[in-house]
């Protein structure tokens, strides 16, 4: 055997064959582009451990991690959208519904559950953005009203996680009507003195932001969430002015008083649990008391003699 054959033995040759990696094992952060192990990302509630970027979260997963384990009961799960107007744009509406149901695994863009949060009774709902952009149609409106009615019957708080592009254009006037319908339902909740906490996630736009999403007794934003009515480019073309950078992000809205607070997703359970306990006068051993902000003491006024 020659010296070359000794070097090129099978044990010394590295295979150039590509190793196949199962799909869904790794995920790239959409902000810092760091490659992340998907199982670790799920345990971290879809928050990047490198840059703290809050990625979009599936509605069902959000509710399952928000409510206490073994307390979750889904409501109005049988409701499905119908193409009552026989609407067609580049594609039939009924075909869009079928495609959205297949890709998202949900019947429509809102999921409603009742359960407990830190042993406190609560009704929670979440928008599924992957279902036609989380758009609000007649079924979404009906499910939200069902959530309000359940909160009224159970005498408990209501929490909604919004992630929507707005009203569903394929349902025309019927989708616009849901803005008034959901707002009227929340008025009944308010009249009974029950709290509604609205959590605005990325993105919350259009008819949803113009109705139920901004009607919370407390409006909470996730970090860097896009929140507004129309997009920045549309507004700039209308007013013919350059708008401030990030003017539709939750940090800008908090600074200008449009929302009440920004809460990290990993702290959401404890923070909302504390707020609900405070607003409903409910005591639970699992709730960490909310500390009152300390007021800055003003300097004593100087007398003419001291000056």
From Swiss-Prot:
A GO-annotated cellular component: acetate CoA-transferase complex
UniProt domain CoA carboxyltransferase N-terminal: residue ranges: 25-294
Any matching Pfam family: Zn_ribbon_ACC
Keyword entries, A-Z: ATP-binding, Cytoplasm, Fatty acid biosynthesis, Fatty acid metabolism, Lipid biosynthesis, Lipid metabolism, Metal-binding, Nucleotide-binding, Transferase, Zinc, Zinc-finger
Biochemical pathway: Lipid metabolism; malonyl-CoA biosynthesis; malonyl-CoA from acetyl-CoA: step 1/1
Catalysed reactions, as listed in the record: N(6)-carboxybiotinyl-L-lysyl-[protein] + acetyl-CoA = N(6)-biotinyl-L-lysyl-[protein] + malonyl-CoA
UniProt xrefs under SUPFAM superfamilies: ClpP/crotonase
Location within or outside the cell: Cytoplasm
Stored InterPro entries: AcCoA_carboxyl_beta, Acetyl_CoA_COase_Trfase_b_su, ClpP/crotonase-like_dom_sf, COA_CT_N, Znf-ACC
Domain of life (superkingdom): Bacteria
PROSITE patterns (alphabetical): COA_CT_NTER
Keyword check for Lipid metabolism: yes
Record: residues binding Zn(2+): 29, 32, 48, 51
ZnF C4-type: positions: 29-51
GO BP annotation list: fatty acid biosynthetic process; malonyl-CoA biosynthetic process
Cofactor requirement: Zn(2+)
E.C. numbers: 2.1.3.15
Co-factor: note: Binds 1 zinc ion per subunit.
GO MF entry, a single one: zinc ion binding
HAMAP family: AcetylCoA_CT_beta
Role description: Component of the acetyl coenzyme A carboxylase (ACC) complex. Biotin carboxylase (BC) catalyzes the carboxylation of biotin on its carrier protein (BCCP) and then the CO(2) group is transferred by the transcarboxylase to acetyl-CoA to form malonyl-CoA.
Family per record: Belongs to the AccD/PCCB family.
Subunit description: Acetyl-CoA carboxylase is a heterohexamer composed of biotin carboxyl carrier protein (AccB), biotin carboxylase (AccC) and two subunits each of ACCase subunit alpha (AccA) and ACCase subunit beta (AccD).
Protein name listed in UniProt: Acetyl-coenzyme A carboxylase carboxyl transferase subunit beta
Gene from which the chain derives: accD
